[in-house]
Amino acid sequence: MKDKSQIRVVVGMSGGVDSSVSAYLLKQQGYDVVGVFMKNWDDKNDSGVCTVTEDYQDVAKVASQIGIPYYSVNFEKEYWDRVFTYFLDEYKNGRTPNPDIMCNKEVKFKAFLDYAMSIDADYIAMGHYAQLRRDEDGRVHLLRGADDNKDQTYFLSQLSQEQLQKVMFPIGHLQKSEVRRIAEEAGLATAKKKDSTGICFIGERNFSKFLGEFLPAQPGEMVTLDGEVKGNHFGLMNYTIGQRKGLGIGGDGKSNEPWFVIGKDLKTNTLLVGQGYHNEHLYANSLDASKLSFVDDISDCGDEFHCTAKFRYRQKDTGVTVKFNEDRTKVEVIFDEPVRAITPGQEVVFYDGEECLGSGTIDHAYKESKLLQYV
């Protein structure tokens, strides 16, 4: 068994408090820690501020404070080729992708992991709110973070056993408030820095405007299922299933209830809308999914198994039955109770209690075996 001082851990440092505390804790525990800042997008935010420069300066400050070397590595090409082109293709096809999941799978835990191994790392570490349990035989289990409100296993659900065996999550057992407290007590420069939001690496900006720079918007009609035109949309890519905001339709019609997106018709470039949060056309009983990835071999589960699932981040778990197709490349997921606004392109993530089993990308939603006109 190596002494901790001989175990090199390369920490992905974003300039935020979570990765700062991750690096600090590992250093305190005696590991050989190296900080690496990933540069994956070359741009300014909507305020004209180059946040990449600011973030790297924060990494430099924290690394100096805790006494570790730090570097910046450019993964712009990998991000564009492996994540952003997929992101754009999904939007072109009327779907709503989750770039953070693909970003973790292809950049943070693949391109970055490969780089870390090239500089003799034993592990990489990230500031994610997730936990790992390691069996005696070396197998790794991905567990929810201790902070229910911050748990990020949803975004890590496409990671493989091989990837996770080389990973540490130093703050996964902590509450966010504890992470802030540790940062403040250690005097870290990022202790009071606000959490980042927005698309992985791209940051906070007007999303429709940003998307329009790469995909020209094609306006069309907003129509009810009865064929009544209610107005015009600004391009199907700007809307997602269950969306209310931005439709610009008053509460007219049969009731005074607000209007929601209930589907998209790509052939006619039509946005389908309906009234009421609990509109029956927003509820599905099942879905099918592909691009499956499981953390560990689940062949002993047979052709079907029961577990819980999430269909979007921070959503309450729903009981489901998962049925594999013949070659186990796709699954049918049947819900214990109807679920609102199942969205093609998003991820269905499977759980067994606290353990994240893996996930698949949602292709279609169904109500009583009838395909819902979501795309």
Curated annotation (Swiss-Prot):
One of its GO terms (biological process) is tRNA wobble position uridine thiolation. It is found in: Cytoplasm. It catalyses: S-sulfanyl-L-cysteinyl-[protein] + uridine(34) in tRNA + AH2 + ATP = 2-thiouridine(34) in tRNA + L-cysteinyl-[protein] + A + AMP + diphosphate + H(+). GO terms for molecular function: ATP binding; tRNA binding; tRNA-uridine 2-sulfurtransferase activity. Its EC number is 2.8.1.13. The active site is at 103 (nucleophile), 200 (cysteine persulfide intermediate). Its main location: cytoplasm. Signal peptide: none annotated. Residues 150-152, 312-313 are annotated as: Interaction with tRNA. It holds the Pfam family tRNA_Me_trans_M. The record marks 128, 346 as: Interaction with tRNA. InterPro entries: MnmA-like, MnmA-like_C, MnmA-like_central, MnmA-like_central_sf, Rossmann-like_a/b/a_fold. The keyword Membrane does not apply. Gene3D superfamilies: Adenine nucleotide alpha hydrolases-like domains, HUPs, Translation factors. Keywords: ATP-binding, Cytoplasm, Disulfide bond, Nucleotide-binding, RNA-binding, Transferase, tRNA processing, tRNA-binding. Residues 98-100 are annotated as: Interaction with target base in tRNA. Disulfide bonds join 103-200. SUPFAM superfamilies: Adenine nucleotide alpha hydrolases-like. ATP binds at residues 12-19, 38, 127. Belongs to the MnmA/TRMU family. NCBIfam families: PRK00143.1, trmU. Catalyzes the 2-thiolation of uridine at the wobble position (U34) of tRNA, leading to the formation of s(2)U34. PANTHER family: MITOCHONDRIAL TRNA-SPECIFIC 2-THIOURIDYLASE 1, TRNA 5-METHYLAMINOMETHYL-2-THIOURIDYLATE -METHYLTRANSFERASE. This is tRNA-specific 2-thiouridylase MnmA.
